Amino acid sequence: MIKNKVFLIGNAHLDPVWLWRRTEGYAEIKATFRSALDRMNEFEDYVFTASSASYYKWIEESEPEMFEEIKERVAQGRWVIAGGLWVQPDCNIPSGESFARHLLYSQRYYLEKFGKTANFGYNVDSFGHNGMLPQLLKHGGIGTYVFMRPDKVENPSLPTGLFNWQSPDGSRVLTYRLTTSYSDDYYSPERFPEYAGLS
C-alpha cells in the first residue's frame, strides 16, 4: 500500500483595495498576518504563505514588531514569501514594463528585507494571464506559477492541473491551475480525501 503524504500550508488571498477602502484592506492584512503568527506559536509545524510585497511594506511601516516576527519566521522557513509581484495585478491589460517593474520592485524589496526572493509566482485571483508571463517571470527569478482564473467553467480550453507554460520566446514555467475555486466547499473536511487524491 502506498502511503500519501499531504502538506497543508496556511494561505490568505487578500484583495485589500478591490471592494474595501484601503484602511479596511490594511486592517484585514494586519489581522490575517497576526493570526498566522499566532498559529505558528500554537503549532510548531504550522507553515504560512502570503503574496504581494505591498502587504509586507504596510506591516513594516505600521507594525514594526510584527514585521520582525515575520522576518524571523521567514528565516526559519515557516513563513514563505510568494508571488514576486507588488500586488496580484490584472494580468492581461498592463504592459510588459509594468510587469517588469512589479517583479523588480517586489523581488528587490524581498531581498533587502528577508535576504531572499520569492521563487514561485502566485496570482490565484487575477483575471486572465498575458502570454508573455512565463518570459517575465523567468527574468524575475521565478520558475513556477500558480493561478486559478479563469476557472475551468469560465474557460475549459486551458489546461487544468500541472503543465509547462511557454511564452513565444521559448521561456517556460512549471504552472499549476487550481482545479477548483479556493473558496468553495470542495475544501471541506468531508471532501478533502477526494481532493487530495486519497479516496
Predicted regions: what they are:
Residues 1-199:
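Catalytic-domain carbohydrate-binding cleft regions of carbohydrate-active enzymes
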